[in-house]
Amino acid sequence: MEDETELCFRSNKVTRLEMFVCTYGGKISSLACSHMELIKILQIAEPVKALNCNFGHQCLPGYESLIKTPKKTKNMLRRPRKTEGDGTCFNSAIEASILFKDKMYKLKCFPSTGEIQVPGVIFPDFEDGKNIIQQWVDFLQHQPIEKKIQIIEFKTIMINFKFQINPVSPRVIIHLKKFAALLEHIPTPYPIREIKPPLEDSKVSAKFMVSPGKKVRINVFLKGKINILGCNTKESAETIYTFLKDLISVHWQEILCVLPVPD
């Protein structure tokens, strides 16, 4: 098969944009206490499997592995992170381990503000993130807390997306240096703050400034996988996706190349 034929695409030049992980969030009514005070009030019970805080730890029987313990310092030259208590958890937060559809989620709650974070959300409609927050609120409502707890809002904090070039042959790869050069000279939907050239031919990385103070990173890998990382809305990811899809379609002869047939 000729190289030009190898460079042909299927009917869709790239796969569709997919979310692969999200940090989901929300806000609950203020608990009117600090994490140090709250961890002393809470009594472990279903649906929460474990509670971790820099000032206390609890778990249900059989979930002892979820209890966090202090880590040994590995790099003595690195400036140590400022910690509180035993330093096992995020400062000012209580971490709750909650199960949803066979996946364990680690919810972070900041009691003084009511802010909630749920990393590792994988459902495109955020069903898992919403369910974990609701389970946490249900748990709190059965605790010896005077204030009524309710959900004020749900929100996305950070969403990561991915897609892939879709050639007819696995021998087709992205010429990373040429791809980086195109990003430097072709107008983009958002200003590019930096472009990191390929390191050992592994990937090209670029940062788009999608709003004041908010940067979205793209990673373009040799074999055609493309990640859009750190979005706070699907719309910004779709705008970058459309730009990259058009870039690949128009310049595919420049940025794609064919590996030789192995002996």
From Swiss-Prot:
Keywords: Early protein. Induction: Expressed in the early phase of the viral replicative cycle. It comes from the Viruses. Possibly contains a TATA-binding domain. Putative TATA-binding protein. Belongs to the asfivirus B263R family. This is Putative TATA-binding protein pB263R. It comes from African swine fever virus (isolate Warthog/Namibia/Wart80/1980).
